[in-house]
Amino acid sequence: WSEYDQEKPLTLTGKVVESGYEHPHGHIRLETPAKTWLVVLAPPSRMQNRGLPREEIKVGSTVTVVAYANRAKPEEARAERITAAGKTVELR
């Protein structure tokens, strides 16, 4: 995970325009006012065990993530936590 800048956490809120709940890591494409991000999530089993089922990050949902930007890919970030459907889930 060293490719992500953990010194500068980002808080991103937007609409989910793509959602993947597959191994090894889930992902969402998050449309924010500034740009659209590819947000790397946790493995699906971890998300499910921590109370974040697939249905809560479906396309059209509004979510907030605290994430770290990828140093080499400016459109990508790794989520530390996500708030969806009124609850916050730690992903790491």
List the model feature ranges, each with a label.
Residues 1-10:
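Short boundary/loop segments of OB/S1/cold-shock single-stranded nucleic-acid-binding domains
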Residues 14-16:
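Conserved hydrophobic positions within beta-strands
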Residues 22-31:
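Short aromatic-glycine-enriched beta-strand elements
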Residues 35-44:
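A short macromolecule-binding patch
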Residues 49-65:
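Short nucleic-acid-contacting surface segments enriched for D/E, G, S/T with interspersed K/R
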Residues 70-92:
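OB-fold/S1-family single-stranded nucleic acid-binding modules
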